[in-house]
């Protein structure tokens, strides 16, 4: 078993939780792009390997950043959503975006990324609050649909 040293400060703690190469990209895909399924996350442009994705999802779940929804107990029905703690990583994602925004070659950005860049530069606070609100509504709707599905399954 790997022994992880206890963090010595708040920044070390945060890096221990989210500082690997993949965790913030997974949180980005969940919160900004509303991806919920393993396959959707695996197919992101960064091409994360399946074993690494599974490991990071488990770590994010254990650390309270995401919740695993599994209505039928099958891999195909499994979805991942950000928790309140996970949604709180959005400002970190935005700050990293702002940190790199002036040095990134815009030709590598797709239309969605260019739109996000424009919105963040225009009004970062509005962008952040709108995205949080949209994601919370999305998750509420998803959970409502899953509850209906479970209820129908019980009736049959």
Language-model features, listed with the residues they occupy:
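C-terminal regulatory/oligomerization modules of transcriptional regulators
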Residues: 91-156
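Canonical helix-turn-helix DNA-binding module
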Residues: 44-75
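Short, contiguous, well-ordered secondary-structure segments
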Residues: 5, 14-17, 29-30, 64-70, ...
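Basic, amphipathic "hinge/linker" alpha-helix immediately C-terminal to the N-terminal HTH DNA-binding motif
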Residues: 19, 72-96
